[in-house]
Swiss-Prot record:
EC number annotated for this UniProt entry: 2.3.1.-
Keyword ATP-binding: no
Metabolic or biological pathway, per its Swiss-Prot or TrEMBL entry: Secondary metabolite biosynthesis
Cross-referenced PANTHER family: PROTEIN THEM6, PTHR12475
Function: Thioesterase; part of the gene cluster that mediates the biosynthesis of oxaleimides, cytotoxic compounds containing an unusual disubstituted succinimide moiety. The first step of the pathway is provided by the HR-PKS poxF that serves in a new mode of collaborative biosynthesis with the PKS-NRPS poxE, by providing the olefin containing amino acid substrate via the synthesis of an ACP-bound dec-4-enoate.
Origin species: Penicillium oxalicum
Any Pfam family: 4HBT_2
Name of the protein: Thioesterase poxG
Record's keyword annotation contains RNA-binding: no
EC primary class: transferase
Sorted UniProt keywords: Transferase
Lineage, highest ranks first: Eukaryota, Fungi, Dikarya, Ascomycota, Pezizomycotina
Amino acid sequence: MVSLSCLISYGECLLETVQTHPWSTIGVVVFLSSVKNAPLMWHARLIIAVFYHSVTRKNDVVTIERYGRQGLFGYIVTSSRSPLYECDINGHKSDSTYFSDLDINRIHLITRLFKGAGDLSLRPDRPNVAPEDRPKKMRVLLGGTCCSFRREIKPYAAYEIHSRVLAWDEKWLYVVSYFVKPGSARKMASLQTEVGDKCEMTDLARSMVFTSAITKFVFKDGRKTVRPADALEEMGLLSASEEVVEISEAGEDLWTRSRVEERRKTGIKIAQHFIALDELHDQFEHVSEHPFLGKFGVLGTMF
């Protein structure tokens, strides 16, 4: 047990160090409080996430048998703060930094939910499908993302990112992400039993959200695009059968295939607005019709 005299001695030494090297102390404090933005830290966080799900927890696979059909829509949650280097001139988290946070959160979701994409040994048996018809090694590639900002995140404020599968169509799988206050999910769960009015629940949910984002992914087997529904069935996350499956880690609220499809259709209605943004690519053809107002480099007109 540390004695009081030792703590006092340690405090005096620390104070002396601060007084002797004030600028070095400030530098260390700033670095430690912004370690999230240190060089190569983004890469390290990404590699750690992939290693954890692909090596350390390789056999912890999400399947219908373990989590039920609702497991496909399960959330991945990551937590973070907004350090000094992420703040803009307005004094809150810069808009551009949301995307680097999303990268880390989504890599957790992809490597947790779609482990069977790149590893055939983690996929369930499909006796009714010929081996040559099954995708060999699928890649999950990012196709686009978009953020809708609602409220600012203050410097060093804590927040969580909740992401899940929203829907899918013939080519793309859509993921929705929410930047929310810590503990929002638990609060919503407790309020659901207390608040009966759906409009009131919607208002409460909206008040907890800082930012919402939507992302689309495509499954690739070599250069061939794999339909999301086929990819999900291949990984044991989607079943065409209405048969109720015995599950080990989900609650008693068992989902049918019809309910999954209903949830997909609800999500695709929202995703349609994101899909429409692909038409923006065609608008560049009119570039010659409008004047150029200036061209600038990294440091204005100098470079």
